[in-house]
Every structure is written in structure tokens, then in C-alpha cells.
């Protein structure tokens, strides 16, 4: 399957020059377009193994030649004047790709005369690919401050004129970023003279470049130098990476050491901070409330003096009324908890027996002592009763149970 498509490319400065020339004249203008036509065939193979060939023709409009008056190479019926046409296109006849016309305040439609003239030009120029560019400027504001320029490109196909797409190439278009496959056909005379003058220094008679072999040798040596530099850069990057790893490792070790030092300093500060003996302070304030000497200093658990001022803090202790001597079993490292419990039980029992014998002898002495008067005997009995904290029943009960009354001891 084969298909054809035609597109035209017009540079921005050529279109700007056409518009500038037309706006600086008082009448319509016309002329010829110069450039080249390129054809490319694209072959696309589908999954069904069918070849799809598409031929794309690109009309590259590069320059223009203007005629300074109308009907300069044709008459009113559209017939071409060969002498006038040869005079206008003396040396660029093979570069003509079409012609143009600028009409003021008209529609984008080809007239009958323009159609006849286009067919006659195809015959005289022996080119069936001629195109016609129609430019129609108009004023869109009453103050004539804004103008509009419309353009359209026509090409005859099967006896009818069809519009073909025209692309105005600007600087910001992505299509112009690629390289051109062929050079422009419309070169200036100055460029040709400059190339002809210096071509003998760079080109041979057959058109090939001189010193191509030396240039290739220089290219090879540059490639070798580039490879060696790349190897050096790779080694240096490896060394830098190793150094960075070492630096990161050392930073981590330094951080760990600093954290360990801070932790040790924090623990040392906590150990140096003395702890107040709250139990001793509360006991002294409870049993000796009027003795300022005992309140004048605060003693820590390790027998260290904290401050010289008296302690006025009320410690929230629930058992301050039942304060007693606290014996720590850690003072006797050779004694086990079971043995210590046994010793405490025996000590309580012996203390109870001793107390019972002492109180019994005490009561016997009072009874055997001769009384002077009845009053004295009653007083002695009352005193003995008051002095003994327990009655006989309580003594018997305590003796049987093995307990003793708790009292504050210092």
C-alpha cells in the first residue's frame, strides 16, 4: 500500500519580509517563490508482514523574487509572456517552486484568472509541483492599529486546487533542532565566492578533504587519552569513597565514646548527690520537738553532713508514730535469711523470759517490804501498778505467745 503527502515549510523571516514589503506598497503585489522539493519514502512493516510505503514531499521555501507591478509577465486573460518571464527568472528558473500574490481585503479563494495563470506557468516551467501562496491582509479595527494577515498554500491535484499544510519555522520550534539532510539550493553569491577561494586549502580536486588520515590519527590519540583519564578518575573516586567510609566510621566511634562519657558523668553525679535520712529526721522531730540542737543539721544515710540549717520539711510518712530501730540484715553477711529469722525469734523469747523474771522479783520485793502505814502501802501498791505496763493476765498471755510490746528504742 502506497500513499503520498505534501507539506510546505516557510521560514519566519521570509514571511516577515513579504508582509513588510506588502505593507509598504499602495497596491497588490506578486512574485515567485524559490526553494527545493524533497521526497522521503517511509516503509512501515506491520504484524501481518505487509509493507506500508508512504512518500512524503516537503517543499522548502527559502527565498522569493518580487515583481514591482502587476501583469508584468502575463496579460488579463492569464497568458504568459515568455520574454518577460525569462527576464525575471534568468538564472533561477530551476529553483522556482511556486508563485505568490498579496491581495488586500479579499477572501482566501483563488480567482479564475489565477487558476489559468497557474496552469500556464506549469507548462512554461515544466514543473507540475508548482504551488500558489495567497496572502490576504486586512484591518480589523477602526483606528487601523491592528492588522490581520491570513495565508494559504494551494496545489493542484487531479484538476482541483487543494490547500496543503504550511509550517512557519520559528526559532522555538522543535522541528528545527535536527540536522538537515541536504544543503539549501539557494546559496548566496558571496558564500560561493568565499568557499571557492579557500576550498583548495581543504579539499582535493575530487572534492575529498585533505589530511583526513591525520585527523583520524589525532582522533584515535584523543580517545586513548580520554580512556586513561577515565581510569584515573575511577581510581580517585574509589579512594574518595573509601575515605568517606572511614570518616563516617570514625564519627560513629566518636559519637559512641561521647555518649559513654556523658552516661558515666551522669551516673557519677547521681552517686555524689547525698540522700537525706528522712526516717532519722522525722524521729528526732517527733520525740525531741524542743531540742534545736538535734534539728540543726541533716545527716545522710552515709553519715555525711548535708547542710548546717535546720530541716523544716514535713516528710509525708504514714508510720511516723511507730518509728523503731531498723536493723539491716546486710550488716551480717555471714548470716543467711533463715538463720537471721531464727536468731530474731530466739532473741524475742529470751527477752520475754528475762522481763518476766525481773517483774516477778520486783513484785516479790514490794510484798516483803514492811509497810510504815496503810497510806504508804496503798501508795506503794498504786505506784507498782502504774510502773508496771502489763497486768498479770497480759504477762501470762505474752509469755504464752512469745511476743513483747513494741516501743521506740534508740
UniProtKB/Swiss-Prot annotation:
Modified residues (Phosphoserine): 48, 387-388, 407
Modified residues (Phosphothreonine): 391
Gene Ontology terms: cellular component: BRCA1-A complex; nucleus
DNA repair is among the record's keywords: yes
InterPro entries per UniProt: BRISC_Abraxas1 (IPR023239), FAM175 (IPR023238), MPN (IPR037518)
Subcellular location per the Swiss-Prot or TrEMBL entry: Nucleus
Amino acid composition bias (Polar residues), ranges on this chain: 368-389
Keyword ATP-binding: no
Residues annotated as domain MPN: 7-160
Posttranslational mods: Phosphorylation of Ser-407 of the pSXXF motif by ATM or ATR constitutes a specific recognition motif for the BRCT domain of BRCA1.
Biological role stated in the UniProt entry: Involved in DNA damage response and double-strand break (DSB) repair. Component of the BRCA1-A complex, acting as a central scaffold protein that assembles the various components of the complex and mediates the recruitment of BRCA1. The BRCA1-A complex specifically recognizes 'Lys-63'-linked ubiquitinated histones H2A and H2AX at DNA lesion sites, leading to target the BRCA1-BARD1 heterodimer to sites of DNA damage at DSBs. This complex also possesses deubiquitinase activity that specifically removes 'Lys-63'-linked ubiquitin on histones H2A and H2AX.
Designated name of the protein: BRCA1-A complex subunit Abraxas 1
Provenance organism: Bos taurus
Gene: ABRAXAS1
Amino acid at each position: 500500500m502506497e500513499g503520498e503527502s505534501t507539506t510546505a515549510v516557510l521560514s519566519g523571516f521570509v514571511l516577515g519580509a513579504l508582509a513588510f514589503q506588502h505593507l509598504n506598497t499602495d497596491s497588490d503585489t506578486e512574485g515567485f517563490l524559490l526553494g527545493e522539493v524533497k521526497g522521503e519514502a517511509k516503509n512501515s512493516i506491520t504484524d501481518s508482514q505487509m509493507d506500508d510505503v508512504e512518500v512524503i514531499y516537503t517543499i522548502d521555501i527559502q527565498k522569493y523574487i518580487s515583481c514591482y507591478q502587476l501583469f508584468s509577465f502575463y496579460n488579463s486573460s492569464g497568458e504568459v509572456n515568455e520574454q518577460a518571464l525569462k527576464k525575471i527568472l534568468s538564472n533561477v528558473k530551476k529553483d522556482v517552486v511556486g508563485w505568490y500574490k498579496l491581495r488586500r481585503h479579499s477572501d482566501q479563494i483563488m480567482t479564475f484568472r489565477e487558476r489559468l495563470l497557474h496552469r500556464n506557468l506549469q507548462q512554461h516551467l515544466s514543473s507540475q509541483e508548482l504551488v500558489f501562496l495567497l496572502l490576504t491582509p486586512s484591518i480589523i479595527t477602526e483606528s487601523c492599529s491592528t492588522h490581520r494577515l491570513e495565508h494559504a498554500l494551494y496545489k493542484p491535484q487531479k484538476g482541483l486546487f487543494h490547500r496543503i499544510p504550511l509550517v512557519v519555522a520559528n526559532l522555538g520550534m522543535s522541528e528545527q533542532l535536527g540536522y538537515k539532510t541536504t544543503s539549501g539550493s539557494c546559496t548566496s553569491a558571496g558564500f560561493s565566492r568565499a568557499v571557492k577561494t579557500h576550498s583548495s586549502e581543504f579539499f582535493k580536486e575530487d572534492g575529498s578533504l585533505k589530511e583526513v588520515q591525520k585527523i583520524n590519527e589525532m582522533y584515535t590519540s584523543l580517545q586513548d587519552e580520554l580512556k586513561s583519564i577515565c581510569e584515573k578518575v575511577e581510581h580517585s573516586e574509589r579512594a574518595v569513597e573509601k575515605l568517606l567510609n572511614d570518616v563516617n566510621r570514625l564519627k560513629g566511634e566518636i559519637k559512641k565514646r561521647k555518649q559513654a562519657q556523658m552516661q558515666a558523668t551522669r551516673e557519677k553525679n547521681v552517686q555524689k548527690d547525698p540522700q537525706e535520712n528522712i526516717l532519722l529526721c522525722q524521729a528526732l522531730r517527733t520525740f525531741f520537738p524542743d531540742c534545736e540542737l538535734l534539728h540543726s543539721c541533716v545527716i545522710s544515710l552515709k553519715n555525711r553532713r548535708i547542710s548546717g540549717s535546720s530541716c523544716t520539711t514535713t516528710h509525708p510518712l504514714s508510720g511516723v508514730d511507730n518509728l523503731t530501730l531498723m536493723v539491716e540484715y546486710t550488716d551480717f553477711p555471714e548470716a543467711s535469711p533463715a538463720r537471721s529469722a531464727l536468731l530474731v525469734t530466739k532473741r524475742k523469747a529470751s527477752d520475754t523470759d528475762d522481763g518476766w523474771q525481773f517483774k516477778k522479783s520486783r513484785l516479790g520485793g514490794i510484798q516483803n517490804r514492811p509497810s510504815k502505814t496503810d497510806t504508804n502501802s496503798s501508795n506503794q501498791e498504786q505506784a507498782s501498778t502504774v510502773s508496771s505496763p502489763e497486768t498479770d493476765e497480759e504477762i501470762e498471755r505474752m509469755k504464752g505467745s512469745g511476743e513483747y510490746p513494741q516501743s521506740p528504742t534508740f
